[in-house]
Amino acid sequence: EVDFIDAYGLGKWGEAHSMKYIDGKDKIPVYDWITDLYSKNFTNVPLLMNYHRVLAEETVNGWEDEPNPDSEGMLESAIRKGYSLRHDAFGMTGYYKEWEKAFAAKWNFKVPIVLEGGWITGAHHRYWIDPSGKYHEGHPEEVRRAEMEAGEEAHVNMMDFRVGNETETWFRNMDLVERFIRHGGYRLCPVQVMFPKEAESGETLTLTHTWENLGWGYCPNNIRQWNFRYKPSFALIDGNGKVVKTFVDQKAEPSDWRQGKPVSYTMEVELGDVPSGTYTWAVSIADTRKNDVPGLNMAVDAASLTADGWLKVGKITVK
């Protein structure tokens, strides 16, 4: 499956700067034409746009310190068309500056951000000349740490470990990789689930569930391509491991969940014609486009999951 499409691709290295136009007045019309084309033809895969202060500009040296006044409005026009964000120069403090940080902060928890490091530490880049003064020749691990810190500040959902020396140096800094696995992106956890342990067939039941996002990013369930497809769900599983009934909480919204801020919901469900017997209660984050099967991995112990991804949380006897 495709995680995302880099849905612009023009400019030097495809990073939306150092453009060449026959007529400079075509900058915005060209940008609008391309973003319209992608948004109309790719409706299920997330689309990403590089965010920076010289978007689509004919910058002679690639970058300029002064932000172009068109950049913010152009980026926000793409976001309105369903785009999310990426940046290719994390760790390059001469490029990823206050303008970029402020734009990321403005759109945190509204659209996801994807990180790619800028310094190619194993090739021609002299990363030790970075304006921050934090990097030393022969120590690419310093670059990796700065990329991680900048990513956490931007609440990124994904980190691109790239290829070659970048991949090797990330593995030599496994503490950073493990830190992102634990805390990066979104990490959705059901911290409390309350349910009846006995019921009569046909009874109306009250279910309460509390969720927390343990990651610094957010679940982008709100982006146009996902369109709120993922929802918390309960299931009753019989003794043979078969799901006999599911209940989806359409009012619960994973894109609202933030690190350190648990959110609780209460829903009433109809037990219906579930036969008498003992069942296992289970929860998941269901994919409502695929018959409510578990759709997103949860931040839970894998040993507590069924083969198809339901988290077992308790028992109920139906009389």
Residue ranges, per PLM feature:
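Extracellular/luminal regions of secreted and cell-surface proteins that mediate adhesion/ECM remodeling
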Residues: 178-319
